From Swiss-Prot:
It catalyses: an N-acyl-L-alpha-aminoacyl-tRNA + H2O = an N-acyl-L-amino acid + a tRNA + H(+). NCBIfam families: pth. Its EC number is 3.1.1.29. The keyword RNA-binding applies. This is Peptidyl-tRNA hydrolase. The record marks 12 as: Discriminates between blocked and unblocked aminoacyl-tRNA. One of its GO terms (cellular component) is cytoplasm. Belongs to the PTH family. GO terms for molecular function: peptidyl-tRNA hydrolase activity; tRNA binding. The keyword Cytoplasm applies. It is found in: Cytoplasm. Keywords: Cytoplasm, Hydrolase, RNA-binding, tRNA-binding. InterPro entries: Pept_tRNA_hydro, Pept_tRNA_hydro_CS, Pept_tRNA_hydro_sf. It comes from Shewanella denitrificans (strain OS217 / ATCC BAA-1090 / DSM 15013).
Length: 195
């Protein structure tokens, strides 16, 4: 059984960013909300879009911060503090440069790897890195000086299809996480690669 009580999808707000690679975490939460048949609505006290969903009979909060990426922690901390949700009860979905498109992986803890959204969440959670992550592969531009433009750019259709397939699989793995446990969810997700 999962102890996850909050699932966060990282993004930049606004239509101009909606389809950019940096918003992959939000794509996952939107798909999860659709599968759970709930609607994310603006919640000013949590600085984001939020919903309450049920997965296999268990309540879980969904959140997409409406702050810019580097202020994501403000939104996550506001909701987590209000509902007394601990870092280890949080799953944060984010784009991951070090994983190719079409692959997604669960991870517990670790640093921020240069990801500004993760960096701010860690800071706002009192430097506690003990939350779960869903790392959605977006690939790497090959040159660290091109990273900013790359994450804020749109993927070509062939890559987008792979990312969408990995997100669909991540949603199925999340259902396994709530129905069974993280080990089974990881086994399912980590053996998947979109072709």
């Amino acid at each position: 059984m999962s102890n996850i009580k909050l699932i966060v999808g990282l993004a930049n707000p606004g239509a101009e960013y909606a389809q950019t690679r940096h918003n992959a975490g939000a794509w996952y939460v939107h798909e999860l909300a659709r599968v759970c048949n709930v609607t994310l609505v603006p919640e000013s006290k949590y600085y984001g879009l939020a919903a309450r969903a049920t997965l296999h009979g268990r309540d879980v909060r969904l959140l997409i911060p409406a702050t810019f990426m580097n202020l994501s922690g403000k939104s996550v901390a506001a909701l987590a503090n209000f509902f007394r949700i601990l870092p280890e009860e949080i799953l944060v979905a984010h784009d991951e440069l070090d994983i190719e498109p079409g692959v997604a992986k669960f991870k517990l803890g670790g640093g921020h790897g240069g990801h500004n959204g993760l960096k701010d969440i860690i800071a706002q959670m009192g430097n506690d890195k003990g939350f779960h992550r869903l790392r959605i592969g977006i690939g790497h531009p090959g040159d660290k000086n091109k990273v900013s433009g790359y994450v804020l750019g749109k993927a070509p259709a062939s890559e987008q299809e792979k990312m969408d397939a990995a997100i669909d699989e991540a949603v199925r793995a999340t259902e396994i996480l709530f129905k069974q446990d993280m080990v089974k969810a990881m086994n399912r997700l980590h053996s998947f690669k979109a072709e």
